[in-house]
Amino acid sequence: MGPPSSSGFYVSRAVALLLAALAAALLLALAVLAALYGRCARVQPSDLHHSGVPDAASSPRGTQEEPLPTWPPRPTREPAGTATPGHWRPPGPWDQLRLPPWLVPLHYELELWPRLRPNEFQSPTLSFTGRVNITVRCAAATARLLLHSLFLDCESAEVRGPLSSGPRDGALGRVPVDDVWFAFDMQYMVLELGATLQPGSRYELQLSFSGLVYRDLREGLFFSIYTDQGERRALLASQMEPTFARSVFPCFDEPALKATFNITIIHHPSYGALSNMPKLGQSEKRDVNGSVWTVTTFSTTPHMPTYLVALAICDYDHVSRTERGQEIRIWARKDAIANGNAAFALNITGPIFSFLEDLFNISYPLPKTDIIALPTFDNSAMENWGLLIFDESLLLMQPNDQVTDKKAVISFILSHEIGHQWFGNLVTMNWWNDIWLKEGFASYFEFGVINYFNPKFRRNEVFFSNILHHVLSEDHALVSRAVSLKVENFTETSEINELFDLFTYNKGASLARMLSSFLNENVFISALKSYLKTFSYSNAEQDDLWRHFQMVVDNQSKILLPAPVKSIMDRWTHQSGFPVITLNVSTGAMKQEPFYLGKVQNQTLLTHNDTWIVPILWIKNGITQSLVWLDKSSEIFPEMQVSDSDHDWVILNLNMTGYYRVNYDKVGWKKLKQQLEKDPKAIPVIHRLQMIDDAFSLSKNNYVEIETALDLTKYLAEEDEIIVWYAVLVNLVTKDLVFDVNNYDMYPLLKKYLLKRLISIWNMYSTVIRENVAALQDDYLALVALEKLFETACWLGLEDCLQLSRELFKNWTNHPENEIPYPIKSVVLCYGVAFGSDEEWDFLLNMYSNKTKEEERIQLTYAMSCSKDPWILHRYLEYAVTAAPFTFNETNIMEVVAESEVGRYIVKDFLINNWQAVSERYGTQSLVNLMYIIGRTISTDLQITELQQFFGNMLEEHQKLTVRAKLQTIKNKNLENKKRNARMTAWLRKNT
């Protein structure tokens, strides 16, 4: 042993060796981390040679191999499997939502082989294999290819080319594929090449793949089980929109990347196959077990985006007809076809096609149209070119559908999907941020189509009930989104799915309608013809549409606009919300301001550009006036001043074609109230609707006093239009009011006030129900509004309503073939249970067990919650938790029961001992929803604390953090409702 050092520190040999080993290990670890840095999660193709991921530079691969990491598990349909936060990869184009512009797809040769066999569909999944050859044109030199792929296993990948320019497109060579890996979070397949693709050259990507088909998932490929002719059967279908094609085959899954498709489907011989185009031929092939399969090939499609690729494999029958040389077939269950359920849809489909062909002066380009009715289809309907897919409840007429709105619903949806053959299929938006260009216009033309075939159809009133009322109730600045969004605002694929909402469809349709109203229909259609012709088989952006409108406007002199079409319409599509237009009839002063919930006063919350260029169509004393424009925050229009005469009044927003609310000064509202009481018919129905809807919405949000809205209801004894009554009742007798009304003296006053006015319209329709209910089948507005009228009359205790409910319910329970009239069935079932015993409740339970349609089962689910017997409701909750006989996918029974006055206390008591079972059955989010429902009556901080303590053990930590804020919001809303209800009660005392 040597002497110690006089300075520093001493390290023994053993420690030195240990430190050296640790240092070496650290260096090795750093080297491995450096090598692995940037690696994305990969799925190893079975027959591909793999080596490490190169740097991000777009250059050919070297020959040096690197050690491979452990392969991660293959993706599943579980959300957690699609993200790769734990896997490293270098930054690159796979981090972007949009594909890089390196390749342009020209043509797909697609073969799909789902292993669907008769009587072999007990599993929740089945497998499929496929091959796709994609001809692409190289637009930028690259040694790396990106295309979309999700939940697919790549079996092989080759790149051939460049292709010769001859007629046979022969390959001049092959480009080595060194590696294939997947960026799961952005849903990309990445091919690393051994050579660089050259700009201007064409190549063919040859990919083999496999995946799973899920039962009832309704995304990509899915299969469904149904009953037909007494037997359980299966079918397979597709839903590619918006981004599910990539889960069926690797592809360039963006709407602007259109291509032609040759599709081949391999299927069991007992099934038939459908796709976008007519069948070209059939052959046979054997699988490895020697089983024979049918190979069906289809003709080449026009240029179209991947989201329109469609297929179905089924054992269905069909009915057909020919319209202008085009074959139209409707496919459905054999029972449904034999019973004639598809006849109505078949009879109107051809004429709708012909009408739109003539309107746009562009022929439908496909030789056939197949429409298939699936037993269930969550998307309602899909417009795939040549193969439209529907939920059968929205396409097929049942014998008991005569006194329903089913004919109108089928007509609306068929018109919408057929409208897409031009808006969306022929001309496609460049990207999903402008999805309203297809959905908004398809929704708008629903009404034009139906109005053409039924001139008595009340287009304005129906547009209000179906479109405008709903979207104006939900749209407001600060919270709602704009119709057209910036592409750069999107970062995740899931955000695309969120665009299929009220603003895309309803607001888009409303803006199209407003545009048509201030241009006139001829100019509107001329511009659309030009737009559709120019961009046929191509893509367009919103600015392209405005450009064609401007061209048509510039070529005429009758219509003068205060600004270019783009300047006018961009305000409406790029800004969220809508304006409130206020007119002072004494001075003619008009102003606009954004509509905010609760009329936000904090100006710092407002956007810098919070005005619109507003078209004002208006009437004075019943006479239509010239269009004026409000293109600034305020302006004076002397022509809108009114005199002191009782006969002088003004209404803005003719036919409710403008997308805004209208307010008046006190004199203006008083003039309209006086006119309603003197001669309501002098004001058109659509404007009686408008005044009621605007006044109540404005009062709810503090723009006018509630008394102003209530004053407009005094005349209602003279109102015989049920759609106006509908507007009154949905605004006045709200769910919150019904839920809380027993806490106030309002109910007896409201009962007396409304029944005095409602009795006339009630007598009219109750007589029809008793004596000639079939007369309602062509009265769409009555079918829409009757349920609310009936529900309110019974809630107010109108004895004739209660008696009619008892009669209809008893007649049905004694003879189930005597159907309760559909428009009021939910109300009759509810009151039948409410005034019945366990015998009536058990009857509904038995009916529920024998029903197969989800719509009918949900209706019965709600009705059974109407019982007023605590023990029955408690038993109902036990059934709900044990799931027998209730299926998991249906309505959350706990929440339904909690909605009733009796039920909310039963649910609260039930949760004390059963919250774990409720959480397992419905999820912890349901507990949050239940807390909000039960909390509808809270009005103090102490009640909030008590409710939080009650639910404290049931909620997850992250939910507890947000719950108190939500309960505080509910409390504030309840306090506002109390103030509002107190003022309503005071007004009713004076006017009853």
From Swiss-Prot:
Chain positions of site Transition state stabilizer: Y505
Localisation: Membrane
Alphabetical GO biological process terms: peptide catabolic process; proteolysis
Keyword Acyltransferase included in the entry's annotation: no
InterPro entries named in the record: Aminopeptidase_N-like_N, Aminopeptidase_N-like_N_sf, ERAP1-like_C_dom, M1_APN-typ, Peptidase_M1, Peptidase_M1_aminopeptidases, Peptidase_M1_dom, Peptidase_M4/M1_CTD_sf
Residues that, per the record, bind substrate: E241, S380, A381, M382, E383, N384
Designated gene of the protein: LVRN
GO cellular component: cytoplasm; extracellular space; membrane
Topological domains annotated Cytoplasmic: 2-13
Record topology, Extracellular segments: 35-992
Binding site for Zn(2+): H416, H420, E439
Co-factor(s): Zn(2+)
Membrane topology: Single-pass type II membrane protein
Protein name: Aminopeptidase Q
Organism: Felis catus
Effect on the protein upon substituting A139T: No effect on coat pattern
EC numbers, comma separated: 3.4.11.-
